[in-house]
Amino acid sequence: RADNLKPHVMVAAWPWPSYMDPEARDRGIRVRTSSYTRHHVNITMCKAKANGNYINSILALREALDAGCEEALLLDNEGYVAEGSGENVFLVRDGTIYTPELTSCLEGITRDSIFRIAADLGYQVKERRITRDEVYIADEAFFTGTAAEVVPIRELDSRPIGSGSRGPLTEKLQSIYFDTVRGRAAQYAEWLTPVS
């Protein structure tokens, strides 16, 4: 039975190549809304970055890749935007940045970093429920994540987002984020732990 298990911990480290095609950082990626729904908040411990929670994401990503896209967008059980298969999602509309509230998505470290960078640039980030059609008509959209970093979304469901390429605010946030994780942004140095 599962009531007398002893925890075991394993840590593995290996070189991690770019999660997305390096050109995707500049041109953006094509995304497909998944037929799979993000887990309901009461189905599992949605805030846990636990291996078992990722089968939903794996299925959604596989479906998107099979359709010729680079990533999936998952909706929650009520049809609102939740997140990507392994990333948080943001959109920009009329100079304001929006991202889904945390009900159905992981509270990502990179997500939090973008909140701080955006605020330091004078932009407001609003957390609220977002409909899929709001993403369709956004000026810009992008994913954030530890592996994905900051990657522009150029298209959702064969509809171009904004100009159909990386938007200017996404590019600015991306540039500062990349400078930060490479130790070139002194104002965010406390986020880093140098290793030799």
Question: Could you say what each language-model-derived stretch is?
Answer:
Residues 1-196:
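Helix-start/capping segments and mature chain N-termini
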